Curated annotation (Swiss-Prot):
The active site is at H164 (proton acceptor), N385 (proton acceptor). It catalyses: butan-1-ol + acetyl-CoA = butyl acetate + CoA; hexan-1-ol + acetyl-CoA = hexyl acetate + CoA; 2-methylbutan-1-ol + acetyl-CoA = 2-methylbutyl acetate + CoA; hexan-1-ol + butanoyl-CoA = hexyl butanoate + CoA. Coiled coil: none annotated. The fruit of cv. Royal Gala exhibits a high ester accumulation, whereas the cv. Granny Smith contains low ester levels; this influences strongly the ripe apple fruit aroma. This is Alcohol acyl transferase 1 allele RGa. It is an enzyme of class 2 (transferase).
Amino acid sequence: MMSFSVLQVKRLQPELITPAKSTPQETKFLSDIDDQESLRVQIPIIMCYKDNPSLNKNRNPVKAIREALSRALVYYYPLAGRLREGPNRKLVVDCNGEGILFVEASADVTLEQLGDKILPPCPLLEEFLYNFPGSDGIIDCPLLLIQVTCLTCGGFILALRLNHTMCDAAGLLLFLTAIAEMARGAHAPSILPVWERELLFARDPPRITCAHHEYEDVIGHSDGSYASSNQSNMVQRSFYFGAKEMRVLRKQIPPHLISTCSTFDLITACLWKCRTLALNINPKEAVRVSCIVNARGKHNNVRLPLGYYGNAFAFPAAISKAEPLCKNPLGYALELVKKAKATMNEEYLRSVADLLVLRGRPQYSSTGSYLIVSDNTRVGFGDVNFGWGQPVFAGPVKALDLISFYVQHKNNTEDGILVPMCLPSSAMERFQQELERITQEPKEDICNNLRSTSQ
């Protein structure tokens, strides 16, 4: 593997990609789910593609994606606009067609040489997604930054940064799929976008009908936890959950939970427990984990159009005192995670929108120890095909402070899940030790496995 101290990425000056045709000049309101303080962030995504001459016929990926992006913006024209702030900090989209920031780049490296450096927490992210000065604000800035970097092997890396108030992961996928379809020759997206953010406005009058631990300050928390850690001391590391890890974890849960427990539930319970142990939290302190739950689909009964690309999720929180979470078997945490997720339905989402309006769009609570997890393994980023086939990796590239993203990853032998974590450096070492301990096969199982493979 090459030395990345000598990696050279050459970038052309950024340009603004505008819609290929004239689009409406208007102002659009965000939903009350979009317009919350915790979504005023930029989310980075990376997608890595091999050269595929049999499919792309030596086309230039930068040219193909640039042209397709411009055509897709005719349909998704609000993304070419700018956010403005109205009375009481209410966000609106000025659909002025100013455009998306686009960067063409090249790097003297192959995908093979990059190896796992493209995986979360992606130490080379700043090379493949350069933060141009003045581009990363929430108000009056481009809503998307896209950098396409061509590699010497013929492959390329598409990295982007999204203003989260505009879309969630499912909404971003709709936009990326539209670009990909047009890059492959389509005249229009197969799923037409739907704005209709009024579908997730607060009710009139607003009324909070559910408990929302994710927005409530916990009482009696100590100041020695994650929330007060020196941000300069934070480190990122990713952890892999494959067949072996999941097998060991499943052996630790009670029989009545096995058939109803998802991989996401089990990993979340494991991370919550190990993280709490690693942070040495006061046993009497309340600790929380929130699971981001998509409102789309039959399970949650939220009726949204197929092409709706706004934020449509909530993150109900499980809460426990640190002592029982750390001392009880894994099934304790698992049951709390499952119960929290089960609270998500249309009424819960409506109650969130009402709470945000009544309380001035608060951020999720940061008191005490808090972890937020988002399952991106089934979003579909890995299916986005610009004409070069499927990406070798696609998804979020790092954790964001309290938020960890689960991403699909295939190592040399199997499909698994990669989870980036962000913790103080001392806690990260303890977290790794706790995770290794809880996912370690018992010695008798190792011996049995060796006997079965030798027969």
